[in-house]
Amino acid sequence: MRLLIAAVLVLLTLGGCSHKVTVGDLEGFEITVSTQNDVLRKVGEPNKKLDAGDFIVYAYKIDGEEYVLNFVNTPDGYRFLKTSKLTDEFRNFLKEKYENLTEEPFPLAWQ
């Protein structure tokens, strides 16, 4: 029984409860310096990901609103570009850019 309790405690400690991502967390990255790995280490996996080759966008849902982190492809890999709220205007911009670059329909999850 003690072994079972110890195993559960270890799992809770190592797996832990993830902290809630805040807008402040998303705004704390350095432009053209922070990498995708930096972002994933700090705030975890995004709710959605859009990969168009030249750019990648991660979406995080915070308090019922979506915020996106934009990455641009550089010779050194993808680098953080900016954080913004996902508005209809920005979603339409992403749709147009994605469809032009990939010649594929905009993913339903992003519409």
What are these regions (language model features)?
Residues M1-L4:
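Positively charged n-region of N-terminal signal peptides that target proteins for export
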Residues S18-Q111:
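Residues within mature, well-folded domains
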Residues T13-G16:
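C-terminal motif of bacterial Sec signal peptides marking the signal peptidase cleavage site
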